[in-house]
Swiss-Prot record:
Entries under SUPFAM superfamilies matching the protein: Homing endonucleases
Pfam families named among the record's database cross-references: HTH_WhiA, LAGLIDADG_WhiA, WhiA_N
Binding region for DNA: 275-309
Purpose of the protein: Involved in cell division and chromosome segregation.
Organism: Bacillus mycoides (strain KBAB4) (Bacillus weihenstephanensis)
PANTHER family xref list: CELL DIVISION PROTEIN WHIA-RELATED
UniProt keyword Membrane present: no
Gene3D superfamilies referenced in this protein's UniProt entry, alphabetically: Homing endonucleases
Official protein name in the record: Probable cell division protein WhiA
Assigned protein family: Belongs to the WhiA family.
Length: 316
């Protein structure tokens, strides 16, 4: 089961206040429902591939309106051939849609979220929970980039969801897709806040555990890469220094170098694996700092480059 499916399964087991049940159900019917007329009767089909969500819708309708509800199961014939669960409402369809503020009394469609559904903070959380159950998805934090989104067919409703989320300081953004609109989150911290808002506390804990391990692994990798880069840089510098010292020795001899440079050149040539700090501790006349050793080695590099350019180098 995917991380998103586990999250939704957890949400379908939450208990709610009566006012919150109405808010969640409104989001579920608005986003997953479709209307049809048969034998001069209006019916509502709420379709989902998630059995737990279908049971949730069925229970909320029975509890809230005491109506006859049908639960149908069909199998997709394409792609994954998953089961499709259809919750069918044939009684009081018009009255329920009006009560859930999906249509007006004249049966015109309400495209945004009615304020009556989200007057209380608990109801705002419940509407977002219903919206996530109906059209939401969240990436597995273990295998991909952090991303949570809620899909809506209508721009006005999508903008309302974004506004509702940002009322909780989530910094959500909207984007137009080919067949609708999405409100999305990209920051890991905001995704965990959203999971907390809608009541997915187990999913939140798992997300955070994975995120901590993942961030720690990334930090270690960055540190290792940095250490490797520094090591490669150090090795490259040492090889260059040794090559330059050999070139000077074979061309004009190390005796051409000033005494201080000649001593460092001989030490670098004879002890190729030691660090600059260790070289500084090996010189006669007292310890020299790494920067001091580096300075002398740069002077040796300059002399080697002059010799390669055909210039004459006299001993100073």
């Amino acid at each position: 089961m995917s991380f998103a499916s586990e999250t939704k399964k957890e949400l379908t087991n939450l208990e709610m206040k009566e006012c919150c049940e109405k808010s969640e159900l409104s989001a579920l019917l608005r986003m997953n429902g479709s209307l049809s007329f048969s034998n001069r009767r209006l019916s509502i089909d709420i379709q989902t591939e998630n059995a737990a969500i279908a049971r949730r819708i069925y229970t909320l309708l029975k509890k809230g309106y005491d109506v006859t509800v049908e639960l149908l199961v069909r199998k997709k014939m394409r792609l994954k051939k998953n089961n499709v669960y259809i919750v069918r409402l044939v009684e009081k369809s018009r009255e329920i849609l009006a009560d859930l503020h999906i249509v007006r009394d004249d049966f015109s469609f309400i495209r945004n979220i009615s304020q009556e559904l989200i007057e209380k903070k608990c109801c705002k959380r419940s509407y977002l929970r219903g919206a996530f159950l109906a059209g939401g998805s969240v990436n597995n934090p273990e295998t991909s980039s952090y991303h949570l989104e809620i899909f809506s067919l209508y721009k006005e409703h999508n903008d309302s969801i974004c506004e509702l989320m940002n009322g909780f300081d989530l910094n959500s953004k909207t984007l137009e897709r080919r067949k609708g609109y999405i409100t999305y989150l990209k920051e890991a911290e905001k995704i965990t806040e959203f999971l907390n808002i809608i009541g997915a506390h187990n999913a939140l804990l798992r997300f955070e555990d994975i995120r901590i391990v993942r961030d720690m692994r990334n930090s270690v990798n960055r540190l290792v890469n940095c250490e490797t880069a520094n090591l490669n840089k150090t090795i490259g510098a040492a090889l260059r220094q040794i090559e330059n010292i050999r070139y000077i020795d074979e061309t004009v001899g190390l005796d051409i170098l000033p005494d201080k440079l000649r001593e460092i050149a001989q030490l670098r040539r004879d002890y190729q694996d030691v660090t600059l700090k260790e070289l500084g501790e090996m010189v006669s006349g007292g310890k020299i700092s790494k920067s001091g050793i580096n300075h002398r080695l740069r002077k040796i590099d300059e002399i080697a480059e002059k010799l390669r350019a055909g210039e004459t180098v006299a001993k100073k």
